[in-house]
């Protein structure tokens, strides 16, 4: 069942499952962006509980990252939890983050989870519309910057490395009229093209298009996929003024931990399915 009705039915009838106990991540290193709260934090906690040797929390605010670190260590004291600053609204910050990652002795898993949902038009300091800058341009740049350590680790270990981009089912729900413009990015930056929630949906479609194109071009045993985390009661919606959203969340939304299960599933399963879009913990064709 597709469309919005199908979405809400699945939210009620499917419950995300945690990783099986036999999934072990011993010795591995992961980077998770947007990891100070919500799904990114929950995914980091779950992977740490499965023996992950090191998790790097990519966060905009270091103090919030340090609080998340302590939360992970309470559960998994043997995990090496590091907090690295990265700002998706600064190309310089993302480049510095990527350069720092080149010094890692290994990088097995990357989950790009940082995102915003701004329903009011706003330009980031880069000059690009904020949803597009953070959700698409920032995510895409980081995926490129982290490819080399992922490839190097796969070559060294003989096992595929994983890059998971957190997308959304809402990517199906946008007409993406900007695609008809001579310059898509320039049109997305114009205020009169902005349609609130539709722009967030478009940014998630751009995630899928980027993931598919990148996956088709990457060699070196790096499996790249995208995941729909589902509707979760997370901080993503904190500035959403939509009437009745709190009521909908109370009825339909999964917990951040359940959304995190979807992320860890995508980052550890379907090793032979590059370019996959995963939803409700299965492969969507």
UniProtKB/Swiss-Prot annotation:
Role played? Short chain dehydrogenase; part of the gene cluster that mediates the biosynthesis of the phytotoxin solanapyrone, a causal agent of early blight disease of potato and tomato. The prosolanapyrone synthase sol1 is a polyketide synthase that produces the octaketide desmethylprosolanapyrone I via sequential condensations of 7 malonyl-CoA units with one acetyl-CoA unit, and one methylation step. The octaketide backbone is further methylated by the sol2 O-methyltransferase to yield prosolanapyrone I. Prosolanapyrone I is hydroxylated to prosolanapyrone II by the cytochrome P450 monooxygenase sol6.
Matching InterPro entries, A to Z?
NAD(P)-bd_dom_sf, SDR_fam
Q: In which pathway does it act?
A: Phytotoxin biosynthesis
User: Kind of enzyme, top EC level?
Assistant: oxidoreductase
User: Where are the coiled-coil regions?
Assistant: none
EC number(s) stated in the UniProt entry for this protein? 1.1.1.-
User: What name does UniProt use for this protein?
Assistant: Short chain dehydrogenase sol3
Q: Where is the active site?
A: 168, 200, 204
What keywords are assigned to this protein?
NADP, Oxidoreductase
Q: What family does the Swiss-Prot or TrEMBL record give for this protein?
A: Belongs to the short-chain dehydrogenases/reductases (SDR) family.
Q: Membrane-crossing residues?
A: none
PANTHER family, sorted: DEHYDROGENASE_REDUCTASE FAMILY PROTEIN, PUTATIVE (AFU_ORTHOLOGUE AFUA_3G08550)-RELATED (PTHR24320:SF252), RETINOL DEHYDROGENASE (PTHR24320)
Q: Please give one Gene Ontology molecular function term for this protein.
A: oxidoreductase activity
Can you tell me which residues bind NADP(+)? Answer: 39, 64, 87, 200, 204, 234
- Is the keyword Magnesium assigned to this protein? no
Q: Which organism is it from?
A: Alternaria solani
Lineage, broadest ranks: Eukaryota, Fungi, Dikarya, Ascomycota, Pezizomycotina
């Amino acid at each position: 069942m597709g469309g919005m009705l199908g979405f809400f039915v699945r939210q009620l009838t499917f419950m995300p499952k945690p990783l099986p106990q036999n999934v072990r991540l011993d010795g591995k290193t992961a980077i998770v962006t947007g990891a100070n709260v919500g799904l990114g934090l929950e995914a980091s906690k779950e992977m740490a509980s499965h023996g992950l040797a090191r998790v790097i929390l990519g966060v905009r605010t270091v103090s919030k990252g340090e609080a998340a670190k302590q939360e992970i260590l309470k559960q998994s004291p043997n995990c090496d939890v590091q907090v690295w600053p990265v700002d998706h609204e600064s190309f310089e910050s993302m480049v510095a983050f990527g350069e720092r990652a080149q010094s890692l002795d290994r990088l097995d898993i990357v989950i790009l989870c940082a995102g915003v949902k701004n329903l009011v038009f706003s330009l980031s300091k880069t000059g690009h519309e904020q949803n597009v800058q953070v959700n698409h341009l920032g995510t895409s740049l980081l995926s490129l910057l982290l490819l080399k350590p992922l490839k190097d680790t796969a070559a060294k270990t003989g096992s595929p490395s994983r890059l998971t981009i957190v997308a959304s089912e809402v990517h199906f729900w946008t007409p993406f009229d900007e695609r008809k413009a001579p310059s898509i990015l320039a049109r997305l930056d114009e205020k009169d093209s902005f349609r609130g929630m539709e722009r967030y949906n478009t940014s998630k479609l751009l995630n899928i298009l980027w993931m598919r194109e990148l996956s088709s071009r990457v060699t070196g045993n790096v499996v790249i996929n995208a995941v729909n985390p589902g509707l979760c009661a997370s901080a993503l919606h904190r500035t959403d003024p939509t009437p009745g959203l709190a009521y909908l969340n109370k009825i339909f939304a999964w917990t951040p931990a359940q959304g995190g299960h979807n992320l860890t599933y995508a980052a550890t399963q379907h090793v032979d399915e590059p370019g996959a879009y995963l939803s409700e913990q299965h492969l969507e064709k």
